[in-house]
Amino acid sequence: SVTFNAIVVTLVEHGVTPSALAARLTYAGAPEALQAAVAAGLCGLGTVFVGSTEGAAKMLYEAIPFGEKPTRPLADMAKDIVADHRARKLIVPGLGHPLHKPIDPRTPRLFQIAAENGLSSHYVALMQAVQEEAERVSGKSLPINATGAIGAIAAEFGFPWKIIRGFGVMARAIGLVGHILEEIDDPMAIEIWQRVEKEAGGPRQD
Protein backbone atom coordinates (compact mmCIF):
# COMPACT_ATOMS: atom_id res chain seq x y z
CA SER A 1 0.00 0.00 0.00
CA VAL A 2 0.99 3.64 -0.36
CA THR A 3 1.12 4.05 3.41
CA PHE A 4 3.27 0.98 3.98
CA ASN A 5 5.64 2.11 1.24
CA ALA A 6 5.93 5.50 2.94
CA ILE A 7 6.84 3.78 6.21
CA VAL A 8 9.57 1.74 4.55
CA VAL A 9 11.02 4.68 2.60
CA THR A 10 11.18 6.74 5.79
CA LEU A 11 13.20 4.05 7.57
CA VAL A 12 15.71 3.25 4.82
CA GLU A 13 18.36 5.82 5.71
CA HIS A 14 19.37 7.68 8.87
CA GLY A 15 22.91 8.84 8.19
CA VAL A 16 26.21 7.53 9.53
CA THR A 17 24.71 5.83 12.58
CA PRO A 18 26.44 3.13 14.66
CA SER A 19 24.73 0.47 12.53
CA ALA A 20 26.03 2.06 9.32
CA LEU A 21 29.52 2.24 10.81
CA ALA A 22 29.33 -1.41 11.85
CA ALA A 23 28.40 -2.37 8.30
CA ARG A 24 31.18 -0.29 6.78
CA LEU A 25 33.84 -1.56 9.19
CA THR A 26 32.79 -5.17 8.68
CA TYR A 27 32.90 -4.72 4.92
CA ALA A 28 36.39 -3.23 5.20
CA GLY A 29 37.54 -6.42 6.90
CA ALA A 30 35.54 -8.88 4.79
CA PRO A 31 34.71 -7.34 1.40
CA GLU A 32 33.92 -10.78 0.00
CA ALA A 33 30.90 -11.07 2.35
CA LEU A 34 28.52 -8.18 1.73
CA GLN A 35 25.74 -10.04 3.54
CA ALA A 36 27.87 -10.22 6.70
CA ALA A 37 28.38 -6.46 6.62
CA VAL A 38 24.64 -5.86 6.26
CA ALA A 39 23.93 -8.33 9.07
CA ALA A 40 26.47 -6.59 11.33
CA GLY A 41 24.69 -3.30 10.77
CA LEU A 42 21.25 -4.78 11.39
CA CYS A 43 22.39 -6.11 14.77
CA GLY A 44 22.69 -2.49 15.90
CA LEU A 45 18.99 -1.74 15.51
CA GLY A 46 17.41 -1.48 18.94
CA THR A 47 15.49 0.83 21.22
CA VAL A 48 17.63 3.85 20.31
CA PHE A 49 17.66 3.41 16.53
CA VAL A 50 14.49 2.14 14.82
CA GLY A 51 13.18 0.19 17.83
CA SER A 52 11.05 3.01 19.21
CA THR A 53 8.51 2.12 16.52
CA GLU A 54 7.59 -1.02 18.43
CA GLY A 55 7.73 0.82 21.76
CA ALA A 56 5.25 3.42 20.55
CA ALA A 57 2.90 0.79 19.14
CA LYS A 58 3.08 -1.28 22.34
CA MET A 59 2.27 1.80 24.41
CA LEU A 60 -0.77 2.57 22.26
CA TYR A 61 -2.02 -1.03 22.24
CA GLU A 62 -1.75 -1.18 26.04
CA ALA A 63 -4.04 1.83 26.23
CA ILE A 64 -6.45 0.69 23.50
CA PRO A 65 -6.27 -3.01 22.56
CA PHE A 66 -6.62 -3.55 18.82
CA GLY A 67 -10.21 -3.94 17.73
CA GLU A 68 -11.55 -1.99 20.70
CA LYS A 69 -12.61 1.63 20.97
CA PRO A 70 -11.41 4.15 23.54
CA THR A 71 -13.43 3.97 26.74
CA ARG A 72 -12.26 7.35 28.03
CA PRO A 73 -11.28 10.70 26.54
CA LEU A 74 -7.91 10.42 24.80
CA ALA A 75 -6.57 13.38 26.78
CA ASP A 76 -7.19 11.50 30.04
CA MET A 77 -5.52 8.39 28.66
CA ALA A 78 -2.55 10.48 27.56
CA LYS A 79 -2.19 11.93 31.06
CA ASP A 80 -2.04 8.43 32.52
CA ILE A 81 0.53 7.28 29.94
CA VAL A 82 2.84 10.24 30.53
CA ALA A 83 2.46 10.04 34.32
CA ASP A 84 3.28 6.33 34.27
CA HIS A 85 6.43 6.86 32.20
CA ARG A 86 7.57 9.73 34.41
CA ALA A 87 6.96 7.69 37.58
CA ARG A 88 9.11 4.89 36.19
CA LYS A 89 11.69 7.37 34.84
CA LEU A 90 11.18 6.10 31.30
CA ILE A 91 11.31 8.03 28.06
CA VAL A 92 7.98 8.12 26.24
CA PRO A 93 8.70 6.20 23.02
CA GLY A 94 8.27 8.09 19.78
CA LEU A 95 8.76 11.59 21.17
CA GLY A 96 11.63 14.02 20.77
CA HIS A 97 14.43 14.44 18.27
CA PRO A 98 17.90 15.99 18.66
CA LEU A 99 17.64 17.90 15.36
CA HIS A 100 14.00 18.25 14.35
CA LYS A 101 12.35 20.80 16.64
CA PRO A 102 9.62 21.90 17.13
CA ILE A 103 8.40 19.52 14.39
CA ASP A 104 9.89 16.45 12.78
CA PRO A 105 8.97 17.24 9.14
CA ARG A 106 8.54 13.56 8.33
CA THR A 107 5.72 13.15 10.84
CA PRO A 108 3.02 15.41 9.34
CA ARG A 109 3.68 13.92 5.92
CA LEU A 110 3.36 10.37 7.24
CA PHE A 111 0.15 11.27 9.06
CA GLN A 112 -1.17 12.95 5.90
CA ILE A 113 -0.52 9.86 3.80
CA ALA A 114 -2.12 7.65 6.46
CA ALA A 115 -5.21 9.87 6.61
CA GLU A 116 -5.55 9.90 2.83
CA ASN A 117 -5.57 6.10 2.91
CA GLY A 118 -7.98 5.55 5.78
CA LEU A 119 -5.37 4.81 8.43
CA SER A 120 -5.79 7.68 10.85
CA SER A 121 -8.03 6.92 13.80
CA HIS A 122 -7.65 6.69 17.58
CA TYR A 123 -4.05 5.44 17.64
CA VAL A 124 -2.76 8.43 15.70
CA ALA A 125 -4.97 10.72 17.78
CA LEU A 126 -3.74 9.17 21.04
CA MET A 127 -0.11 9.56 19.97
CA GLN A 128 -0.80 13.24 19.32
CA ALA A 129 -2.51 13.57 22.71
CA VAL A 130 0.47 11.93 24.41
CA GLN A 131 2.80 14.41 22.73
CA GLU A 132 0.70 17.37 23.90
CA GLU A 133 0.61 16.06 27.46
CA ALA A 134 4.34 15.29 27.53
CA GLU A 135 5.16 18.80 26.32
CA ARG A 136 2.76 20.33 28.84
CA VAL A 137 4.24 18.44 31.77
CA SER A 138 7.91 18.79 30.79
CA GLY A 139 7.80 22.29 29.36
CA LYS A 140 10.02 21.03 26.53
CA SER A 141 9.57 20.67 22.80
CA LEU A 142 8.91 16.96 22.23
CA PRO A 143 7.78 16.46 18.65
CA ILE A 144 6.42 13.13 17.51
CA ASN A 145 9.39 11.74 15.65
CA ALA A 146 9.21 9.60 12.54
CA THR A 147 9.41 6.33 14.46
CA GLY A 148 6.64 7.46 16.78
CA ALA A 149 4.46 8.30 13.80
CA ILE A 150 5.27 4.94 12.22
CA GLY A 151 4.42 3.13 15.46
CA ALA A 152 1.02 4.83 15.55
CA ILE A 153 0.30 4.13 11.88
CA ALA A 154 1.43 0.51 12.24
CA ALA A 155 -1.06 0.20 15.10
CA GLU A 156 -3.77 1.55 12.79
CA PHE A 157 -2.87 -1.27 10.40
CA GLY A 158 -3.22 -3.73 13.27
CA PHE A 159 0.28 -5.16 13.05
CA PRO A 160 1.39 -6.92 16.27
CA TRP A 161 3.82 -4.65 18.10
CA LYS A 162 6.40 -7.45 18.38
CA ILE A 163 7.02 -7.49 14.62
CA ILE A 164 6.96 -3.75 13.92
CA ARG A 165 10.72 -3.37 14.39
CA GLY A 166 10.98 -5.83 11.51
CA PHE A 167 9.83 -3.11 9.11
CA GLY A 168 12.83 -1.06 10.16
CA VAL A 169 15.12 -4.07 9.79
CA MET A 170 13.78 -4.69 6.29
CA ALA A 171 14.08 -1.05 5.26
CA ARG A 172 17.46 -0.42 6.86
CA ALA A 173 18.94 -3.43 5.07
CA ILE A 174 18.41 -1.48 1.85
CA GLY A 175 20.06 1.57 3.37
CA LEU A 176 23.05 -0.44 4.56
CA VAL A 177 23.60 -1.80 1.06
CA GLY A 178 23.69 1.83 -0.03
CA HIS A 179 26.29 2.61 2.64
CA ILE A 180 28.42 -0.29 1.43
CA LEU A 181 28.18 0.96 -2.15
CA GLU A 182 29.34 4.35 -0.92
CA GLU A 183 32.12 2.64 1.05
CA ILE A 184 33.32 0.99 -2.16
CA ASP A 185 33.35 4.28 -4.07
CA ASP A 186 34.45 6.60 -1.27
CA PRO A 187 35.88 4.60 1.66
CA MET A 188 35.81 5.92 5.22
CA ALA A 189 36.02 2.75 7.35
CA ILE A 190 39.81 2.40 7.32
CA GLU A 191 40.27 6.08 8.13
CA ILE A 192 37.81 5.77 11.04
CA TRP A 193 39.68 2.72 12.35
CA GLN A 194 43.05 4.46 12.07
CA ARG A 195 41.78 7.62 13.78
CA VAL A 196 40.27 5.64 16.65
CA GLU A 197 43.50 3.67 16.97
CA LYS A 198 45.45 6.92 17.16
CA GLU A 199 43.12 8.95 19.37
CA ALA A 200 41.77 6.32 21.76
CA GLY A 201 44.10 3.38 21.51
CA GLY A 202 46.96 4.79 23.58
CA PRO A 203 50.64 4.09 22.93
CA ARG A 204 51.26 1.11 20.72
CA GLN A 205 52.98 -1.82 22.43
CA ASP A 206 55.07 -3.89 20.00
Task: Show where each model-derived region lies.
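Non-transmembrane, aqueous-exposed alpha-helical and coiled segments at domain scale
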Residues: 1-206
